[in-house]
Amino acid sequence: VLKKIEEFEREGKFDVDVEEDPPTIVLTPENIDYLREKMSSKIKRIFANEMGERFLDNLLKNNKLIIKQVNGIENLNKVKTGALITCNHFNPFDCFTVEKVFRMSENEKDKRLYKVIREGNYTNFPGLYGFFFRNCDTLPLSSNKRTMVNFMKAVDTILQKGDYILIYPEQ
């Protein structure tokens, strides 16, 4: 992947994905409840976030994820409006780290952290990780234009509510 990044950078291909992802199932508007308005979506969100929090705490407790230090949390504490959060991203555990830092912040009690994810992460993953990808306050992108209109409306609503959205630069 790193060699491909260098190659695409030299060639000016900044909009081409360097990862060779498997084909994905297209996410259509009727298959996503971005704002968790349906009762079933709300219940799954609560359950998934509780399971996800326990999973993260277990990773930290067993030293499978180590966060050596956190710099700049005071800046996050000052943000009182909706905000987009971004960071460098190369490891699947990056999302867990950002989630933990968010939970350490003063805003954790009255704000929610949504995560923008790839379409394939939402539609293709089976099992526990798939359940998390579909229900832990995720906002999947889509190759379907109608779905993306709904995505943008949801982003606007979330930011207007004062919540946060994590998006990685490569998305």
Question: Where do the language-model regions lie?
Answer:
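Soluble catalytic domains of membrane acyltransferases
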Residues: 66-171
